[in-house]
Every structure is written in structure tokens, then in C-alpha cells.
Amino acid sequence: PDAIAQLLNEGKVQLFCADAVDGEGLLNGDLPQRRRAELQEKYFVYLTAELAPRILTLNNAKKGTQIWTAGVDLGAYHAVHCRLRRPTLFAGAVGMGGIYDLTRFWGTDSDDMVLRCSPLAYLQENGIANKPALAKAEENCLILCAGQGAYEGDALDDTQALADLLKDQGMPAHLEIWGGDVSHDWYW
């Protein structure tokens, strides 16, 4: 990552990569919807209760240490989901080509666990996202972007819908819509 090479070399930034369980949970059509949502919630708990504290411990919890999340596609979902639900733990997020409407994967039936895992749904409810903390956040603490190229349609729709919903609720986010040359493909 040449864009942040200097920050990495100076020790100002560290990168951690968390493997996901999307194949076992969210994308596993052989499991009931509730079980898939439970696995997503367990992964969220792992990120927030184990990985993030471990990152802070590795840095001796230096004052001012901030954790940002970033991801592409379902990684964007996880990154933004963590920021929305735990904004006091995660200082910011960058979601690139993200899917935020999980009904695409598990249908429209909903219960408390399914709701808890679906940003476009839970932001319309109270008690799941920390809305007061999100409303105080700076705009550039949540960056949403999507392209207009091949295979980017669902991500573009969800990214725009999430940005609109956040704006309507007074929660700042920075939206970037990239051109038709930005596709939803592996070489990115």
C-alpha cells in the first residue's frame, strides 16, 4: 500500500487483517436465517470484545490510539457495521463497495438478531446503533464509496441508501461515488 507507506514506515499506522466467517454464516444458504445472523453477531462480538482490545493492548493503549476499520464488499459491511454499533471503540470506517441490506442474502423475514446485523434496518430502529455518538462524529469518520462499473450495482444502491439514511437522521458520513471505470472485481 504505497498510499500509506510513509505512515507505516514511521510507525504511525499499523494494519491488522481479520479473517471473516461470511462463508459459514451470512452466505451459507444451508443454514436457517436465525443461525446465520447468530454467526454474524458472534463475529461482531469477536471484533469488538477480542480483536479491538487486543490491538489496543499491543499498542499499550497509548493515549490517542484510534482504531479505524476498512473493507471492500462484505468487508465494507463489517467495517461500517462496527463503526455504527460501536462508535466509541472504532474512531472511523471506510466502506468500499459495501452491501448494507442483508435481505439480499437471507430474505425479508426478520427477528431481533437479523435486525441487529442489518445496518439499513437497524438504523431505522432505536437501541442498536449508538445514534447520539454517531451524530457527534465528524463527517470524515465514516467514508462510504462505491463505483458505477460492472457488478457494482447492489453496492452502489446500498451505499447511496445508507448515506441518505444517515443524513436524514443527522449522522454525518462522507459519500464518494466513483466512475464507471470502478468495477466490483478482484483486481481492485
How does the language model describe each region?
Residues 1-188:
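Non-catalytic cap/lid and distal C-terminal segments of serine-dependent acyl enzymes
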